[in-house]
Amino acid sequence: MGIKMAESSSSPRGSSLTRDNDVVLPDAPAISTPVKPEDDTNSRAAGVALEDLFDEDDDQLQAELVFTSSNTIPSSPPQPASDSSSQTIADTQQESYSDSGLMKQFYSRFFPFRSLFQWLNHSPKPGPDFGNREFALTLQNDAYLRYQSYPNSDMLRKDIIRQNPSRFEIGPVYTTNPRDRKTLRKSSMFRPLSKEIVFDIDLTDYDDIRSCCVKANICSKCWAFATMAIKVVDVALRDDFGFEHIIWIYSGRRGVHAWISDKEARELDDDKRKAITGYFEVLRGGTQSGKRVNIKRPLHPHIVRSLEILKPYFQQVLVDQEPFMTQAGQERLLQLIPDKALGDALAKKWASSPDRPSTRKWADIDSLAATGVSKSLDTKALMEAKQDILLEYTYPRLDVEVGKKRIHLLKSPFVVHPGTGRVCVPITTGGDMKRAEAFDPFSVPKVTDLFREVDLFSSTTEGEEQHQNGSAEDRVTPRKINDWEKTSLRPYVEMFDVFVKGLLKSEMTRVKRERDEEGVTGTDGMEF
C-alpha cells in the first residue's frame, strides 16, 4: 500500500508549512532515590535463543493469521465496569491510583505485555523493531527514565514489574539499542529510524467553546468533541492518505490518542510528518486573534467531507454548550458575520432577548438576511462565513506538535491514568465509527475495579464448579484463564488483539511479496 496524498500538496488551508525549532528531550535527570539499573546481561546474554521463548505461541499465531480476517470484531463489546462492592485490596486505594502495591499487581496480572510486544515488533518473534525501541518510565518518585529498551516481551514485563512505574511511554525505533547510545563513537550514529504516526486530542483545547466543563473535567456533552475529532481524522487518514492500521486510545481522562502503524507511516521522515499534521490544521490562533478559520475556496475535498460529518454535531453543540448565550459568545459570533448591516440588526434583535438560546440566534442569521435588512448583502460570503463558524466550533483541535517528530514519546496503551485510575483502553479501530460513537469514558474500568471483578469471577466460578456433575475422569481440563479475561478489561484487550493480528497479517503479506519479487524461495530468514 502506497501513501495516497490529497490532490493538493498543501494542507486544506492552502498555506505553506513552517519549520518549528523543536527541542530534543535530554537524557533522564538524576533521580533522588537510587534505582538499580537494568542488568545488561539479561538483554545481551550470548547464545540465548529468544525465539524458543515464543515458538509454541508463534505457530498458533501464524495459523490464526491465515484464517482470521483483520476485520473480525470481538464477540463481546466493551461493558461498563462492575459496580460490585465486595471488599478487596482496592477498597483502600480509591484516592491513590498510582499506589505502588496496586500498580505492581496491575502490571503482573492485567497488563497485556505480549500483545503490546507483537504490536511494536510487527512480528511474533523478537527483532530490532522492538529491541531498538525506546521506552521511558515515570517512577513512583517522579524520576523519569529515558532510553530503556528490551529484547522481548518477557524482559519488558519483568522490568516494568521491578521498576513499577506509575506509567510508561513509547518512543521510536533507533539505529541501535538505546541503552548503547553512549558507547558510539559519534552521537550522530544514534538517530531515530521509525515510529508510528501519532495524534493527540485534548479537550482542554476546547475550553473556549465548551461551557459544561473546564480544564481536566469532562462530561458526556463535551466528550462529543472527541467523537467528532475521531470521525473526521480517521476517515481522512484512510481515504486521503491510504493508511489502514489505525487505532484510537483513550488517554484515561480528557483526551484521545491515534496510533497509525502502517509500515509506510512508520518510516516517514519528520518533514512528511509535519505535512500530514499540517493537513489537519484548519484552526489557527486563539480566541483573541480574530477569525480562526481562513480557508480557500473552492473548498478542499477534506473540508467538504468534514462539514458533512460535523453539521449534525454542530446543532447539538448549540444545544449542549450554548456558545452564543453569553454576551462574550454573542459578540464573538457577530465578529464573524461579514456584513455590518446584518450584524447590527442581529445585535439589536438579541439585545431585546438576552436569554435567546444559541439555536435561535443561529437561525436568526438566515431569517434576518432574508428580510433584506442589508442592501449590499453578499449571500455567498455569508454562506462561507457560516461554514467557517461551524468549523471553528466543531473541527478537530489537534496538538500538532505531537505528530511532527519521530522522537516524540506518547503514553502506552493500557497504562493507568494516575489521576482517574482509568485504564487507557482502545476506543475503536478498523474505521468502526459506531464503536467510537458508543464509547463512554465513564464506563472505562478503573484499576481498582479489576481486582473486585476478579474476586467476583472467582467466587462465581467456584460456585458453579461445585454444582457440576460427572466424575473427574470425564472432565476436560480447561485452559488457564488470564486475570484480564475475568474483568471488564477483556473486550478492550480483545479489540487490541484483533488490531494487532490485522497488522501482523499485513506485515506477513508484505514480507512474502518482497521475497517473491526478489526470487527467494523457502522460509529461511522469514520473520514469521
Predicted regions and their residues:
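Extended, amphipathic alpha-helical scaffolds
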Residues: T429-F528
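SsDNA-processing nucleotidyl-transfer enzymes
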Residues: E95, D99-K215, V400-V402, P418, ...
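Residues forming anionic-ligand binding surfaces in small-molecule and nucleic-acid pockets
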Residues: N71-P74, S84, M189-I218, L283, ...
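Catalytic micro-motifs at enzyme active sites that drive phosphoryl/nucleotidyl and oxygen chemistry
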Residues: K182-M189, D234-R238, G242-Y250
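Long, well-ordered alpha-helical scaffolding segments within enzyme catalytic domains
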Residues: N217-F243
